């Protein structure tokens, strides 16, 4: 039984899909006016992992993640660069895929662009106007929050508190300060589409409501995104969607917490961000994913070079274990398991059971990773050169099986690792010739930390794993 923390009801609940064995999941994707930063990357990695885990547990997942490709920020960027908004969108969607692929984020079932759904959005807006939930003023169309009885139920605030606490730009044309635009009249220099209210473009909130409804249906299983989207974006999505259809919009709402730098939320507006591409130039995708999944997705995560280095060391420990097993598979002579080994292999299932228990409990990736470490500690101790090839192979398959939903630990250590070690040994040999013994010792210690021991023999330097 999988339990998820439902932001809507402020508690963990058993996940029961609308259709048995299927999950309809919508995740708010990027506004494509720049490279995405590692804070955005955490959101994408978290929900990629959750999607993978549902699939691991046997569900068929329809996973929709949108691109916001018409937006104030995009218009500003296009005007600054003297190109069209479409060109900005095309460019940064391509860049998104490059970085997401590099982070081993699986492609969505569908990645809709808002501009592909303008006709559907206009129908959606017209439906809200016809039902009395929205009104037009000078070509703008606003959603009337007071008309929707449940407004504020996701963020847990009542509308009076929201009015008094929110910093709202004064617009005398609105019936209420909390009303928000679902269609915006064209301004000079902006792209626009013809509508019953004149030339204009959709508001941000209406885009996701419309695409989710069109691609997944009036009620979906899971709507997810970063916790900064809870209000107003997701609150407004609920209001629009449920006002139009009269049905619950999403049964479960999942929100991932911020990534912080110096105890402040990482964001483009604060200019304290690192793009995913910058980090990928220096660290492997497994390292970045490990760091992003090392805390529960609802816990804020601090980001620093030290934590990246710690994640790198942890990932290397697991790949050392994988490398040991790969070497044993090549080196051991006995093919099949004996009865004692079969019993030992069966005992390893306790780590899989612990892993599933933790992931079933609101996707606790931090504790699931601990279960993998416990597994490799066991295999490092008990699977040796005297073991069978079959046992080493089965243990390796189990490590990879548990790593797959996390998007990690799938690479082979053969070739690349050996080349890297040989290069370090050559560097150490040169340091010794140059009588730079401090560097030679540093390289030896670095290799030892990675589970590699050097032996100086008359035939030259040999290395082995420990």
Curated annotation (Swiss-Prot):
Q: Which UniProt keywords apply?
A: Aminoacyl-tRNA synthetase, ATP-binding, Cytoplasm, Ligase, Metal-binding, Nucleotide-binding, Protein biosynthesis, Zinc
GO terms in the biological process aspect are:
cysteinyl-tRNA aminoacylation
Q: Taxonomically, which superkingdom? A: Bacteria
User: Which InterPro entries does UniProt cross-reference here?
Assistant: Cys-tRNA-ligase, Cys-tRNA-synt_Ia_DALR, Cys-tRNA/MSH_ligase, CysS_C, Rossmann-like_a/b/a_fold, tRNA-synt_1_cat_dom, tRNAsynth_Ia_anticodon-bd
**Which positions in this protein are listed as binding ATP?**
268
Give one GO term, molecular function aspect.
cysteine-tRNA ligase activity
UniProt keyword annotation of Nucleotidyltransferase present: no
Disulfide feature: none
User: Which cofactors, if any, are listed as required?
Assistant: Zn(2+)
Q: What is its EC number?
A: 6.1.1.16
Does the keyword Aminoacyl-tRNA synthetase feature in the UniProt annotation? yes
* Amino acids binding Zn(2+): 28, 208, 233, 237
Please state which protein family the record places this protein in.
Answer: Belongs to the class-I aminoacyl-tRNA synthetase family.
Listed under subunit, the entry gives: Monomer.
Protein's UniProt name: Cysteine--tRNA ligase
Q: Which organism is it from?
A: Clostridium perfringens (strain SM101 / Type A)
The coding gene here is cysS
